[in-house]
Amino acid sequence: MKLSIIIIATSLVIAVVAFPSKDSKAIENDKTEQRMEIVVQETARACSKQIGDKCKRNCECCRKTVVCGTIYVGGKEVNQCMDKTSDNAILNGLGKGMNFIENTFSFCV
Protein backbone atom coordinates (compact mmCIF):
# COMPACT_ATOMS: atom_id res chain seq x y z
CA MET A 1 0.00 0.00 0.00
CA LYS A 2 2.79 2.42 0.93
CA LEU A 3 4.68 1.54 -2.23
CA SER A 4 1.68 2.39 -4.42
CA ILE A 5 1.27 5.78 -2.68
CA ILE A 6 4.96 6.56 -3.24
CA ILE A 7 4.70 5.58 -6.92
CA ILE A 8 1.59 7.72 -7.44
CA ALA A 9 3.14 10.71 -5.65
CA THR A 10 6.35 10.40 -7.67
CA SER A 11 4.36 10.19 -10.91
CA LEU A 12 2.43 13.36 -10.03
CA VAL A 13 5.63 15.26 -9.23
CA ILE A 14 7.18 14.19 -12.54
CA ALA A 15 4.03 15.22 -14.42
CA VAL A 16 3.98 18.67 -12.79
CA VAL A 17 7.66 19.29 -13.55
CA ALA A 18 7.59 17.85 -17.08
CA PHE A 19 4.56 19.78 -18.33
CA PRO A 20 4.86 23.53 -17.66
CA SER A 21 1.65 25.51 -17.53
CA LYS A 22 0.44 27.76 -20.33
CA ASP A 23 0.78 30.77 -18.02
CA SER A 24 4.56 30.42 -17.84
CA LYS A 25 4.75 30.45 -21.64
CA ALA A 26 2.67 33.62 -21.74
CA ILE A 27 4.91 35.31 -19.19
CA GLU A 28 8.02 34.35 -21.17
CA ASN A 29 6.50 35.78 -24.37
CA ASP A 30 5.64 39.01 -22.53
CA LYS A 31 9.27 39.34 -21.42
CA THR A 32 10.46 38.88 -24.99
CA GLU A 33 8.08 41.56 -26.25
CA GLN A 34 9.20 43.92 -23.50
CA ARG A 35 12.87 43.42 -24.43
CA MET A 36 12.05 44.13 -28.07
CA GLU A 37 10.26 47.37 -27.12
CA ILE A 38 13.24 48.55 -25.08
CA VAL A 39 15.60 48.01 -28.00
CA VAL A 40 13.28 49.95 -30.32
CA GLN A 41 12.83 52.82 -27.85
CA GLU A 42 16.55 53.37 -27.27
CA THR A 43 17.44 54.89 -30.64
CA ALA A 44 20.62 56.81 -31.27
CA ARG A 45 20.28 60.57 -30.78
CA ALA A 46 22.74 63.35 -30.06
CA CYS A 47 22.62 64.80 -26.56
CA SER A 48 20.57 67.97 -26.20
CA LYS A 49 19.74 68.27 -22.48
CA GLN A 50 21.74 69.23 -19.41
CA ILE A 51 21.40 68.07 -15.78
CA GLY A 52 17.93 68.99 -14.48
CA ASP A 53 16.23 69.16 -17.91
CA LYS A 54 13.26 66.89 -18.63
CA CYS A 55 14.07 63.87 -20.80
CA LYS A 56 12.68 60.63 -22.20
CA ARG A 57 15.86 58.65 -23.01
CA ASN A 58 19.45 58.39 -21.80
CA CYS A 59 20.73 59.54 -25.18
CA GLU A 60 19.14 62.96 -24.73
CA CYS A 61 21.29 63.72 -21.66
CA CYS A 62 24.82 65.09 -22.20
CA ARG A 63 27.94 63.83 -20.33
CA LYS A 64 29.08 60.27 -19.76
CA THR A 65 27.71 59.79 -16.23
CA VAL A 66 24.33 61.52 -16.76
CA VAL A 67 21.24 59.37 -17.27
CA CYS A 68 17.53 60.05 -17.66
CA GLY A 69 16.27 59.19 -14.18
CA THR A 70 12.86 59.23 -12.52
CA ILE A 71 11.93 61.36 -9.53
CA TYR A 72 8.54 61.96 -7.95
CA VAL A 73 7.34 65.54 -7.44
CA GLY A 74 4.01 65.93 -5.68
CA GLY A 75 3.13 62.31 -6.42
CA LYS A 76 3.80 62.72 -10.16
CA GLU A 77 6.55 60.88 -12.00
CA VAL A 78 9.06 63.23 -13.65
CA ASN A 79 11.96 62.10 -15.85
CA GLN A 80 15.00 64.37 -15.85
CA CYS A 81 18.71 64.23 -16.60
CA MET A 82 20.68 63.47 -13.42
CA ASP A 83 24.03 62.11 -12.33
CA LYS A 84 23.78 62.13 -8.53
CA THR A 85 22.59 58.84 -7.10
CA SER A 86 23.26 59.26 -3.37
CA ASP A 87 24.35 61.73 -0.68
CA ASN A 88 27.05 59.23 0.35
CA ALA A 89 30.26 59.93 -1.62
CA ILE A 90 31.16 56.24 -2.02
CA LEU A 91 27.68 55.21 -3.15
CA ASN A 92 27.50 58.23 -5.45
CA GLY A 93 30.81 57.21 -7.07
CA LEU A 94 29.51 53.67 -7.60
CA GLY A 95 26.27 55.09 -9.02
CA LYS A 96 28.16 57.27 -11.48
CA GLY A 97 30.12 54.19 -12.56
CA MET A 98 26.86 52.34 -13.18
CA ASN A 99 25.53 55.36 -15.11
CA PHE A 100 28.68 55.31 -17.26
CA ILE A 101 28.19 51.60 -18.02
CA GLU A 102 24.50 52.17 -18.81
CA ASN A 103 25.37 54.99 -21.22
CA THR A 104 28.09 52.88 -22.84
CA PHE A 105 25.50 50.28 -23.84
CA SER A 106 22.94 52.87 -25.00
CA PHE A 107 24.89 53.35 -28.27
CA CYS A 108 24.23 57.10 -28.43
CA VAL A 109 25.70 59.15 -31.27
Swiss-Prot record:
Keywords: Disulfide bond, Ion channel impairing toxin, Knottin, Secreted, Signal, Toxin. Residues 19-46 form a propeptide. Residues 1-18 form the signal peptide. Expressed by the venom gland. Transmembrane segments: none annotated. GO terms for molecular function: ion channel regulator activity; toxin activity. It is found in: Secreted. It comes from the Eukaryota. Its main location: secreted. One of its GO terms (cellular component) is extracellular region. Coiled coil: none annotated. Disulfide bonds join C47-C62, C55-C68, C59-C108, C61-C81. The presence of a 'disulfide through disulfide knot' structurally defines this protein as a knottin. Putative ion channel inhibitor. Belongs to the neurotoxin 25 family. F7 subfamily. This is Hainantoxin-XVIII-3.
